């Protein structure tokens, strides 16, 4: 089954995307998505409405429309479209208002916008991103005392995307260090990392998956051979066990799942931005 899906917002549309995707993931359908942020006025809403209606006329199937919009005028224009429209925030606001006994006070871009109230959190997240970039792939072993977690693993097992996701999503200062082929003859935990053993977390991966990933980068190379991948993964997992470093097999997990599991295993607090 194929459906067109619109994520519409007067802000970034991140909320509409996240909640809409979470709902649609429950259904066995294929989707073509249109994300339309900053639909802030009637003229823009009319243009979006026209786009929705044209797809309906061309396909005969109503597009699915998930929206998060403060302006009543803009909401009503979207609701008059030929799409199957779901106001994902208002559906929760009404019952919550009854429970809290307090009327909502909607403010444009409050969720993902930059305001005086969240400036400190924003600065902390940017600092975490800068830290992750400066300490990616063992570039620098300085200031590891400032790291909240240090990821270890073979090349291409997911360390870099996980470090950056932890920084961007949760403001976690994450460093990462790779074990490369030249290390394997006498693999040991680097002296610079030993004082921070409580911060170390290992990532591993099935050798077959690792070989496929490396093959895309260096085709027909020793680096990408299954034999090499099996050897490296085996050596690094043995190092993790020897040094009692907690680790996770990343093969079947997304970067979001890997990051969340690391926080859970290490007992680290999540911060929302």
From Swiss-Prot:
Positions that bind ADP: 153-160
Enzyme class: transferase
Function: Bifunctional serine/threonine kinase and phosphorylase involved in the regulation of the phosphoenolpyruvate synthase (PEPS) by catalyzing its phosphorylation/dephosphorylation.
EC number of the protein: 2.7.11.33, 2.7.4.28
Keyword Nucleotide-binding: yes
One GO term (biological process): regulation of DNA-templated transcription
Reactions this protein catalyses: [pyruvate, water dikinase] + ADP = [pyruvate, water dikinase]-phosphate + AMP + H(+); [pyruvate, water dikinase]-phosphate + phosphate + H(+) = [pyruvate, water dikinase] + diphosphate
The protein's name in its UniProt record: Putative phosphoenolpyruvate synthase regulatory protein
Family statement drawn from the similarity comment of this UniProt entry: Belongs to the pyruvate, phosphate/water dikinase regulatory protein family. PSRP subfamily.
Keywords: Kinase, Nucleotide-binding, Serine/threonine-protein kinase, Transferase
Highest taxon in the source lineage: Bacteria
Entry-linked InterPro entries: Kinase-pyrophosphorylase (IPR005177), PSRP (IPR026530), TF_DNA-bd_sf (IPR008917)
Entries under NCBIfam families matching the protein: PRK05339.1
Any Pfam family hit: Kinase-PPPase
GO MF entries: ADP binding; ATP binding; DNA binding; phosphotransferase activity, phosphate group as acceptor; protein serine/threonine kinase activity
